[in-house]
């Protein structure tokens, strides 16, 4: 399918850097031995700085902030992460971004966010495929990466827009939580 997709539409891809990501959601942001509240109900700038420090120390390129991050501290966190050579990817519902993706992406870019993890497409039709293309194209305009989660199956769009780092379109290990 990859070779059947349209060739890359981006003139400059030098900014696209795949890599590992720290991610608080997998273990519900529970940290032991810290002197601040942790857990999914206690997400804070302090907690995310801890993760950024850990990612930096372990040469992990990204920190993915899943559901619950706040615009109240995202700009400060992105500045902090940049000093530590860690890039921030933020999670969002597809419905939050699809109404006007350019505005949402511009806002995230202004905060210093490096990418978006877009979730809950909740369909596998041409409309969802169009959303994916639109997200990838608009993110690329701001030199931001995309991670598609709960999305349609990959169809080669990452050839056209190589800023798509990952498709999480399978029923994977996270289903063990339910």
Which sequence ranges carry the predicted segments?
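Conserved structural scaffold segments of CAZyme catalytic domains across common CAZy folds
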Residues: 1-83
């Amino acid at each position: 399918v990859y070779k059947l997709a349209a060739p890359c539409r981006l003139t400059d891809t030098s900014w696209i850097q795949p890599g590992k990501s720290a991610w608080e959601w997998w273990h519900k942001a529970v940290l032991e031995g810290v002197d601040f509240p942790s857990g999914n109900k206690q997400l804070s700038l302090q907690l995310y700085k801890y993760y950024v420090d850990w990612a930096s120390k372990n040469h992990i390129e990204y920190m993915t902030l899943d559901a619950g991050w706040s615009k109240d501290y995202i700009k400060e966190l992105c500045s902090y992460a940049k000093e530590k050579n860690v890039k921030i990817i933020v999670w969002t519902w597809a419905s939050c971004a699809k109404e006007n993706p350019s505005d949402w992406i511009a806002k995230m870019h202004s905060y210093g966010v490096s990418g978006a993890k877009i979730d809950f497409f909740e369909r596998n039709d041409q409309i969802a495929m169009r959303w994916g293309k639109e997200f990838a194209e608009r993110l690329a305009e701001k030199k931001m990466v995309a991670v598609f989660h709960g999305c349609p199956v990959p169809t080669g769009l990452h050839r056209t827009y190589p800023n798509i780092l990952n498709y999480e379109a399978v029923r994977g290990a996270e289903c063990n939580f339910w």
